[in-house]
Amino acid sequence: MDMKVMRFLTGLCAILFAASVAHPAALVSTAKDRRSIGLTIYNNELALVKETRQLKLKKGVFSIRFEDVAQKIDATSVQVKPLGGPGFELLEQNYEFDLITPNKLMDKYVGKRLKLVLPPKKEGDEERVVEAKLISTNNGYVYQIGNEIHLWASGRVILPRLPKDLVSSPTLVWLVKGKGDGVQKLDVSYLTGGFNWRCDYILAVSPDEKSGDFSGWVTITNKSGATYADASVQLIAGEIHRVREYPEDRLFYARAKAAEAGAPQFAEEAFFEYHLYTLKRKTTIKDNQTKQIALLSASGIPLKKRYIVKSWIGMWGADEEKGKVGVYMEFENSKAKKLGMALPKGKVRVYKKDRRGQQQFLGEDTIDHTPVDEKVRLKIGEAFDIVYEGRRTEYRKISRNVRQYKMEYEIRNHKDEAITVEIEVRFYGDWQILEASHRWTKETANRVVFRVPVGAKAKQKVSYKAQVVWW
């Protein structure tokens, strides 16, 4: 063999050997290496994933392929920390998410040769395997078979190998410099989209409507692109600020029946300016799964039913209004009233049993995050047997910016029991009530409430005269 050729081959082998030593085959880590995993799930399409894996590392520079991560991972949020062991230095991080699909596989083979399995030309013949060159994938596949160009060739495609730059699942790839040989634990955390949680509550009202059983279910939805087996789960209730918001996801709502919740499975605590709920056991949350877990259960909480009218006429607007009276249920979230747990925002469905013992749906409302010792008011619907009418009976222009007017309301109660109706009236500008037929309470700077008793099968009129000044 020519001496120059020998020298060239020897040099090439040396280069290849050095490259293989400098960049050995990547170490692959999968969910099998996982020693623990935890999730902190937020209300706004977000979760923090925290996991620990155990690997065997070597001294020197090499790559780690960290597989089985969420498809909706925020790669810029990844944190890697060695726990004990020989340790390593993180030199570079990449996130590979060019996932294998039939279309991407074909795109990678443009300009390359492959095999086509074509159907038989006639019945009784065998399938034909031919070599072809893929010329284009634009709006369909174009092949060169021999000296001919074939469009939309029917049949199966056989590829000789999988392209190196396609991955079957999202993968973090780290270039690290190991400080020694040995077993190494990695503490890895990252943020991911595709997670959400909410609360669905059930209030079962007693026959006398003075108390009720209140239960809550946590509904967790996982569309992150990964499964989390035997995970420790925590929930954050509160409005965290984010620079970029993920789109709202549709949720699975709780079962539409007043099912009794099991024993509370979450421990609640204040955390920073939020509230943290920690599941007392581990659970598996599969990809594309909705899971419900009991949050709380309280029996016999005191309830107060309220009838409320919100009057919208006054100095401006129509002269008359007529409508139904809103029905509300109210309770206090306190230990003295058999609750006393910070309630995450969610939907409350209200039920009551009829005289035959059959559960009936009364209505539903949403609540915001509710601290301990705050009141919860739920609008259930509108009263069938209570009618409200309001009209403006007088209107006077005193000066350019001063007006006086008189309002009259009539409440007609067709029920077999006496009730109290609250009429909420709003004012604008500087106002004063000059005269009124009933006592009233100033609730806010611009809102007063008349609490009007109405007897069974009776009616009651309420009137007031007001003066308003605006600038």
Feature-to-residue mapping (PLM):
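Sec-dependent N-terminal signal peptides
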Residues: 7-15
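Long, intrinsically disordered, low-complexity accessory segments associated with secretion
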Residues: 3-8, 21-471
